[in-house]
Design a protein with these regions (language model features):
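Macromolecular interaction modules
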Residues: 1-218
Length: 218
């Protein structure tokens, strides 16, 4: 990630809506977002499980101020017809954004764990460095959620029943699932106060990515 800010979103999609949802994401929604001032890139992941269609979206932002900036709020208050059809159908919707407080490693892993945490580590940089030192881990990022900036009432927010809240994001990017499991075990050993209150450690695989530098603005 290049920017100081982030926006993280989890949601579930029913099987009969899956094609429409994927087309909406890749053919309209992520393009709309990354052409909004302050958005740098979008990455879409799908959970590695067969019982549910669960997705994780990570947006890279120039700064956390983008979250309640005029450009993004204008988008949120003018959802497209396609967005109006899709958004009310999303289940277990969780959304939050803020500032990245620690990064370690380089590049992006095709396989990730994106954990919601309820307590930030006392020293985020030290935890990030310890986890990225694990075999097969490419990068680790830790973010702090800004509840005020992500709680502004908007038209889109009104289409969803609930967005939940989480204090922070722990993103571990690996070369394979075994690498992620090793890093998870390490995190539990050195930061039990953080991991004891983290969300389920699901594995996600990369599905789609779009960078504002290469998007078709025409």
């Amino acid at each position: 990630m290049r920017g100081a800010g982030f926006l993280a979103i989890w949601s579930d999609v029913e099987a009969h809506d899956l094609t429409d949802y994927r087309h909406w994401l890749t053919r309209e929604h992520t393009t709309e977002r990354v052409t909004t001032r302050g958005f740098l890139a979008s990455r879409v992941f799908r959970a590695a499980r067969d019982d549910i269609n669960r997705f994780f979206i990570l947006y890279e932002l120039e700064a956390p101020e983008v979250l309640d900036g005029d450009a993004y709020l204008a988008r949120l208050n003018a959802p497209t017809p396609w967005s109006q059809r899709i958004m009310p159908k999303l289940g277990n919707f969780i959304r939050g954004g803020g500032i990245m407080v620690a990064r370690a490693g380089r590049g992006e892993g095709a396989t990730i764990m994106a954990l919601r945490i309820e307590a930030l580590p006392e020293d985020p940089a030290t935890l990030a460095r310890a986890l990225v030192a694990c075999d097969g881990v490419a990068a680790v990022q830790i973010g702090a959620t800004d509840e005020a900036r992500t709680s502004v009432p908007t038209t889109e927010k009104g289409m969803r029943r609930n967005e939940g809240f989480f204090a922070g994001l722990l993103l571990i990017e690996g070369l394979d699932v075994a690498s992620l499991r090793g890093a998870l075990q390490r995190a539990r050993a050195i930061a039990p106060d953080v991991m004891d209150h983290a969300s389920e450690p699901e594995v996600y695989h990369g599905m789609f990515a779009l960078d504002a530098r290469i998007v078709d603005f025409g």
